């Protein structure tokens, strides 16, 4: 099998959107290594400034698929701040990969964790409210920020101001004093540290280990009408994600992702989130692309996202949506089976060539 049902796949271009973050790595690698092309797919990668653009372009058919927030599948399907359309995912890009960064001004004022932040907020009542940036209301970053501040007795609705800021603008907003901190994915935590604008106070792998982060989202219409292509995309991403979790793969990714058409950030900064240690993020599993079965959109991962959406008060009634219709592990498993079959065929070919 030279490719997954290659002769039957349509030749229509497939536009896949992405936001320039380190966790889009499997998508970029699949394109750069020719994995999509090998499966007969004509994929165009479209760089977008933020999640609102990704959301709208998926809803209105300007993108066929996207690297997106895991929570956005439910957000679009529920019609949160957008026209409701049934979206789904058959592949999760990664787990973990985010952090909370605060301004060095707050650090100088003695804020180093959530408890010292609380002390500062309640001694600062007559001054301006502390403002945090998040990429989207249904992003893991919103939920992680709430999870960090609430145990310290900080009310996210009353004691701080939480606003939506596109990921690429987080650092400049921190530098200018428009926000006092943020929760976001890489490279925008490491970039703030390198610029002397802020310090990382919490990594998401510490706060909520193995939380689902990004997903490949498509509409149900796309998945139904172009199923073979959808499976082939996921197959290529599974293959790429495995490479992203190897040391050699991460070294290559640092260079590839730094290209201007992708992240456009110095590869030294990108390496800080791909290789943990004294010069980068501290958690060993800061970014997980394939290990521990993180690519499967399982019921347990779906329930985690839904629970976070509910706990944040974003929806009251979830009766109109089934988690099994949004997080489609069955589609992932079908693509995974094709991946295993392809690997077995390749191994058989290698053995025959040696005879």
For each feature predicted by the language model, list its residue ranges.
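Short glycine- and hydrophobic/aromatic-rich loop-to-beta-strand nucleating segment
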Residues: 100-101, 215-218, 222-223
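Conserved C-terminal helix/tail region of periplasmic/extracytoplasmic solute-binding proteins
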Residues: 306-355
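Short gly/pro-enriched beta-turn/loop segments at secondary-structure junctions
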Residues: 210-213, 252
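Secondary-structure end/capping motifs
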Residues: 227-326
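Active-site glycine-rich loop that binds ribose-phosphate moieties when present
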Residues: 163-168, 186
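Short, glycine-/small- and polar/acidic-enriched structural segments
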Residues: 2-157, 180-187, 197-204, 209-210, ...
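Inter-helical turn/loop segments and adjacent helix faces that build the functional surface
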Residues: 155-160, 224-229
